[in-house]
């Protein structure tokens, strides 16, 4: 497990590549856990009370996973598995738009780091990403995520002690 960014640095930097090599060598997944957003993105959330678990954690961690996918981490390491909580930090619900706009961005050549991938973002979520429902004990969301990613990609987890709802068990 790693707490998302490290002092504002993300795992898509080449500096962190040995972590991924080691994970693939020992066939172990990486769990990216939310952390407080870095200073560069927390300001507008903090002043509105949207930092932390209410919104900020998910946005920051979802962005981190998306940065890894779009840099081609799963093209470089096809067997790598990455886990995130909170129903995939909302990425499963954005898949159509993520795929569409990523492909449009690649075609436009507007962003230097946005390159073609071997698969769609949706395909990577179905083969290389595992999610837990921690903090999201809401049946419609769980069923949607299972439908989009596959039942074998969605795991149960309780966000204890931060969110404890005995009925969800």
Where are each of the predicted segments found?
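Active-site gating/metal-coordination segments in enzymes
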Residues: 1-72
């Amino acid at each position: 497990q790693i707490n998302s960014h490290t002092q504002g640095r993300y795992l898509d930097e080449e500096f962190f590549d040995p972590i991924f090599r080691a994970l693939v060598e020992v066939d172990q997944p990486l769990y990216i856990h939310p952390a407080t957003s870095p200073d560069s993105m927390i300001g507008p959330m903090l002043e509105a009370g949207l930092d932390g678990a209410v919104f900020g954690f998910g946005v920051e961690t979802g962005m981190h996973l998306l940065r890894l996918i779009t840099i081609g981490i799963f093209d470089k390491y096809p067997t790598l598995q990455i886990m995130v909580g909170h129903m995939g930090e909302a990425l499963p619900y954005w898949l159509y738009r993520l795929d569409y706009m990523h492909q449009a961005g690649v075609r436009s050549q507007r962003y230097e780091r946005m390159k073609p991938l071997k698969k769609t973002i949706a395909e990577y979520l179905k083969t290389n990403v595992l999610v837990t429902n921690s903090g999201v004990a809401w049946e419609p969301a769980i069923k949607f995520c299972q439908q989009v990613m596959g039942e074998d990609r969605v795991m149960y987890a309780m966000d204890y002690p931060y969110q404890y709802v005995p009925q969800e068990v």
